[in-house]
Design a protein with these regions (language model features):
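Signature of alpha-helical transmembrane segments and their immediate interfacial
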Residues: 1-19, 32
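Structured non-transmembrane domains adjacent to transmembrane bundles in polytopic membrane proteins
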Residues: 18-196
Length: 196
């Protein structure tokens, strides 16, 4: 019984890692490239977190809807672990000099000079225009426990911002590798207690 108790304690006391690079030798090219990325850029660029907002009853180009999405982006950006947010009216990130009015013009006018802006912006809108994607870059390793622990907070921020807006009937989803790792960890923790 004592041996079994020690083994169970070891299961609960162990630190799980969801960073696949932890299992590789430190001198491999993929590990080194991530280290270079982390040194020169925000570590979250390796694997951005995606937020999908689904709503069949809104016009994405309505100024009020755009304002609601801009507020959502500011709310997300105000959290302590977020470095940048990109979405259809800010497809180059929140700090880009290209304003939302220029991006919206690219959707309205067939202008060859605006085509690259339109194409970049369109990557954040589903073909049927019912789903908008926000790309969130964290300022920490997206596979770290700190990043995984942040996912419920991010979900709360998104839901509160949406609920207090004119697009409150929208359905939100948080995706990407960090959110997937959080859900996997949560399921694994629950299953461990059930098994033991």
């Amino acid at each position: 019984i004592i041996t079994l108790g020690v083994m169970i304690f070891g299961v609960f006391g162990s630190q799980k890692s969801f960073d696949q690079l932890d299992s590789l030798p430190k001198d491999t090219e993929s590990v080194r490239s991530f280290e270079l990325l982390r040194e020169g850029f925000s570590p979250g660029r390796l694997s951005p977190t995606n937020i999908f907002i689904e709503n069949e009853n809104i016009d994405l180009f309505d100024p009020k809807v755009v304002e609601n999405f801009e507020t959502l982006a500011k709310d997300i950006l105000s959290t302590n672990l977020v470095d940048d947010v990109s979405y259809y009216v800010r497809p180059f990130g929140s700090y880009s000099d290209i304003g939302s009015s220029t991006i919206l013009q690219s959707h309205k006018r067939n202008d060859s000079q605006l085509k690259p802006l339109f194409e970049r912006s369109a990557q954040f809108i589903s073909n049927d225009k019912n789903v908008v994607k926000f790309e969130v870059v964290l300022n920490v390793n997206p596979y770290s426990n700190e990043a995984l622990d942040f996912i419920p907070n991010l979900r709360d921020v998104v839901n509160q911002s949406i609920e207090s807006s004119s697009i409150s009937e929208s359905i939100t989803y948080i995706g990407g590798e960090t959110a997937e790792a959080f859900d996997t960890r949560k399921s694994g923790d629950r299953d461990t207690y059930l098994v033991l």
